[in-house]
Amino acid sequence: DRDETAFIIVDAPFRLNQTEAISWKQGTTATENGEDGLVTSNTYSAVYYPHAYTTNPATGDNVVAPASHIALYTFAYSDNVSFQWFAPAGLTRGQVQNAASVGYLTSENEFKSVSLTQGNRDTMYNAKLNPIARFPAEGVVVFGQKTLHPSASALDRVNVARLTAYLRERFSVIARPFLFEPNDEDTRRNAKSTF
């Protein structure tokens, strides 16, 4: 039990084109998470699409990397140059190195590159499916930060959900010395100055 201090990055199945990925994300025919759809609405989760065509640094071979790999890279990069409460997306913190294109696997197991238009990206984003797009001048960029939070609020953004998870984890550590202390003015003053 992580007490909602973790963040889960979810992949759409590799074989789905963008229309199928949106249908899968909306999970209209699914009764549980799986190939038929995604039914979860966890605040501390986000789905990214499509996958990326990249190079394995160990072998030099071209491989298809899952969208979660690309998203995780941008999370790490964003955290390195800013903080958890900055969006790991966009042209500043969402650029992906070492990815030539984005797409999906066909039924013949071939990588099919896709080009997401503004309309495609908007439709995906409204369906809580974070687009990974290739821009001519900028390259591959994570261009969304929606969580699977069930309603419109600040928590339907990755940066806010990650900040909340981070604060939960930090508060449990910071508050530990005050356990079993008397609930008096001195303890409250010490706790307030600590927080």
Task: Label the predicted regions.
Residues 1-194:
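Structured, hydrophobic secondary-structure cores that serve as assembly/anchoring elements
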